[in-house]
């Protein structure tokens, strides 16, 4: 079944694209969730009219995501933590902790957008990736220091 994507869908395509999907997937999931519309003559005419607006809107979103990513990459983030005798920190720095650090510096980030392979458990400089858009990922530097310093 041919469908027009109303939003970006992982492993299917991006908003505004016309894709071929299985009829069951379309009828049982995509259409009830309002993620797609069937690609019939009427919907194709509507889609062609709105396509330019969608592209312009997508570019605005990507540009604003790039702006925020650039500002965050230029900023310095520091986490002050308690340290044990062996040089390791008590507990760990999680995505929730990072969200708080970013908010304290004026940036609103969803914890699901923070790409962290494992919680941070050591002092030093760490690089963290934050996904603002599927096409925009920022590499942010975080310094973990002793809270007594």
Curated annotation (Swiss-Prot):
Q: Does the keyword Metal-binding apply?
A: no
Please tell me whether the keyword rRNA processing is annotated for this protein.
no
Superkingdom to which the source organism belongs: Bacteria
- Any one GO BP annotation for this protein: translation
InterPro entries, per database record:
Ribosomal_bL9 (IPR000244), Ribosomal_bL9/RNase_H1_N (IPR009027), Ribosomal_bL9_bac/chp (IPR020594), Ribosomal_bL9_C (IPR020069), Ribosomal_bL9_C_sf (IPR036791), Ribosomal_bL9_N (IPR020070), Ribosomal_bL9_N_sf (IPR036935)
Function per UniProt: Binds to the 23S rRNA.
HAMAP family attached to this UniProt entry:
Ribosomal_bL9
What name does the UniProt record give this protein? Large ribosomal subunit protein bL9
The species is Endomicrobium trichonymphae
Q: What is the lineage of its organism?
A: Bacteria, Pseudomonadati, Elusimicrobiota, Endomicrobiia, Endomicrobiales
């Amino acid at each position: 079944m041919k469908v027009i994507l109303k939003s970006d869908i992982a492993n299917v395509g991006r908003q505004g694209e016309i894709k071929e999907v299985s009829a069951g997937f379309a009828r049982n999931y995509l259409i009830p969730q309002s993620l797609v519309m069937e690609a019939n003559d009427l919907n194709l005419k509507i889609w062609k009219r709105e396509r330019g607006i969608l592209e312009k809107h997508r570019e605005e979103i990507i540009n604003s995501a790039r702006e925020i990513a650039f500002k965050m990459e230029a900023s310095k983030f520091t986490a002050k933590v308690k340290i044990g005798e062996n040089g390791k920190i008590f507990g760990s720095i999680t995505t929730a902790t990072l969200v708080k650090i970013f908010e304290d510096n004026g940036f609103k980030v969803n914890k699901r957008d923070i790409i962290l392979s494992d919680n941070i458990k050591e002092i030093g400089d760490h690089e963290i990736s934050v996904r603002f858009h599927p096409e925009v990922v920022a590499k942010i530097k975080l310094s973990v220091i002793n809270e007594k310093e």
